[in-house]
Amino acid sequence: MSTAVAEFKPSEKLLKTRNIGISAHIDSGKTTLTERILFYTNRIHAIHEVRGKDGVGAKMDSMDLERERGITIQSAATYCQWKNHTINIIDTPGHVDFTVEVERSLRVLDSAILVLCGVAGVQSQSITVDRQMRRYNVPRVAFINKLDRTGANPFRVIEQLKEKLKHNAVPVQIPIGLENDLKGVVDLVTMKAYYFEGKDGMDIQEKEIPDDLKELANKKHEELLDAASMFSDELTEALLEGTPTEEMIKKAIRTGTIELKMTPVFMGSAFKNKGVQKLLDGVLDYLASPVDVKNKALDQNNNEEMIVLESNYEKPLVCLAFKLEDGRYGQLTYVRVYQGKLSKGMTIYNMSNNKKHNVGRLCRMHSDEMEDIDSAEAGDIIALFGIDCASGDTFTDGKLKVSMESMFVPAPVISLTIEAKESKHLNNLAKALNRFTKEDPTFQTHVDPESGQTIIKGMGELHLEVYIERMKREYGVELITGAPQVAYRETITSKADFDYTHKKQTGGQGQFGRVAGYMEPIPLEETLDYDFVNKVVGGAIPREYIQSVDKGFKSCLERGSLIGFPIIGVRCVINDGAYHDVDSSDMAFQIAGRYAFRQGFNKANPQILEPIMKVEVDGPSEFQGAILGSLNQRRGMILNTTEEDAYCKTEAEVPLADMFGYSTVLRSSTQGKAEFSMEFSRYAPVPRNVAEELMKKYKVNNKDED
């Protein structure tokens, strides 16, 4: 750790710590920006481009796969110093298939930089990332990047921030020139012009604002003061007296940002080395320190009551494992310390299973390299070795029994069957699956009890492709993969009664249980998959067997009768039944519940639901016809098309079942000039012809069972 920070008292050290994420739509230049930040803060001594000719790749893209594809898959952690402050940076993926990485890193950050492309503006994944930041109350500044590119228009992007993301977006800079003429930025707080000259933009020249920009700068300066004064009475009074200071303005902007009521907007081009150092100043000036953020935990001794943790190193330890990685040094667990102090040699307890662990080695991470340290305090993000745990586990020193609230994990929407080409690789396949499912909660695996096949599930084709590739590279396992399968669901559309009596007499104690009631669809707005309501009165079913009926119902949810997929959106109400003093049992009522459910389900007009994806396609306007045609052919419903500067953006909803192989089709129909992203939107009923086809297929595959 740098001595500059080590000398401060812990509270002072905390005030000078920033835990930030850099989040964006894919290809907005996020990893390039991180690379420049590391360069200007002396963490690296040469710049390598993401897809550079030197073949080195960006520092933060440490997996071979990432360097080849030029996309960031795992969020690498690193730290740097800037003007006596420590900045911990999590570089997060921009591809929608890797949103769990973004969710995870936002969970442990105090604030973030939202990177936007100066040409494309707010894109679908920018909206997803912004929604995730909102979920975790992450204050953010925006950086409009790529202003050196043809068609760049930062003010249009600011309007999109306001309209699409509903941000109170306020520029704190304006660019000096655009496209090939981009030279620097005007700072609207200091009202000075800054030029980035010399090799790699290291030489920053402060000058007066150019005459042709004075009018615009004054106008935007007034707008900034108006916006900032909403968060500071001191600034409002100073403005009335005509004596506002830079410090007052910065303090007001900082307050608005941390309260999530304002988004300061910075500008530049990371690739052309313009504006990055001023953005770093903005991180220190406007983004939250660990002290500014309220982190909550659930008190396990007090009915999971919410408590607020203090960023204080003298309090009992609470930390969260937010990422696991198998590196060249063994299993690494990335940890954020929220309260207390974590030291080498101390004993910590995993709150999910009460297991004790001894802390053997602590490190600060710089992508895939590391630096050993003796201790870490509240606010630090570090890595531990040899701790067996799952992502999202909470650790304490045993003095507190609390757990951090669990992270929101989206359900997988796609599955594939896999098998090892050679039986000698089965052991390695099991190891790989065990590790990857621990690392990534959206990557799931199970063995189909009927076919005996191993099935992997994930967030999209690319997500599963990356894991298949990693199994090959890291474990030497060649796989045979089946066709991707859609995660269909089954539900009911009307209310239906059930009344089933289970009777069995085979000498000795028999089995008896009667269950009666009805099932009905749960309205979509309730977002419940299943609900059980007990309205039995007068002891028609004894209290101890009510749970047995519920268990029987639940056992039916895994496999519907239409095509064998899970059942959702069903409320089961029991209102009558019967029992026998001798023959009734837990098992008898479970079986009665199971058959009663099937009886009701088949009468309640069941239907098949399919995942509908929100798809966004960006490409040159000349290909708009081809893009619309390709979506219409896939049962797509066009929601919106916008056209700006010879570029068109098409938003549509398309069933996932029709999106397989779309990237190849899009590439060939637009000469590789269009790109698309998709994310899960909702479940919707499949058309009748598709439902009939699916049921026919299911019957053929399962005819031996009946």
Curated annotation (Swiss-Prot):
InterPro entries: EFG_II, EFG_III, EFG_III/V, EFG_IV, EFG_V-like, EFTu-like_2, G_TR_CS, P-loop_NTPase. One of its GO terms (cellular component) is cytoplasm. GTP binds at residues 24-31, 91-95, 145-148. GO terms for molecular function: GTP binding; GTPase activity; translation elongation factor activity. Its main location: cytoplasm. It is found in: Cytoplasm. Keywords: Cytoplasm, Elongation factor, GTP-binding, Nucleotide-binding, Protein biosynthesis. Residues 15-291 form the tr-type G domain. It holds the Pfam family GTP_EFTU_D2. The keyword Mitochondrion does not apply. The keyword Metal-binding does not apply. Catalyzes the GTP-dependent ribosomal translocation step during translation elongation. During this step, the ribosome changes from the pre-translocational (PRE) to the post-translocational (POST) state as the newly formed A-site-bound peptidyl-tRNA and P-site-bound deacylated tRNA move to the P and E sites, respectively. Catalyzes the coordinated movement of the two tRNA molecules, the mRNA and conformational changes in the ribosome. Belongs to the TRAFAC class translation factor GTPase superfamily. Classic translation factor GTPase family. EF-G/EF-2 subfamily. This is Elongation factor G. It comes from Leptospira borgpetersenii serovar Hardjo-bovis (strain JB197).
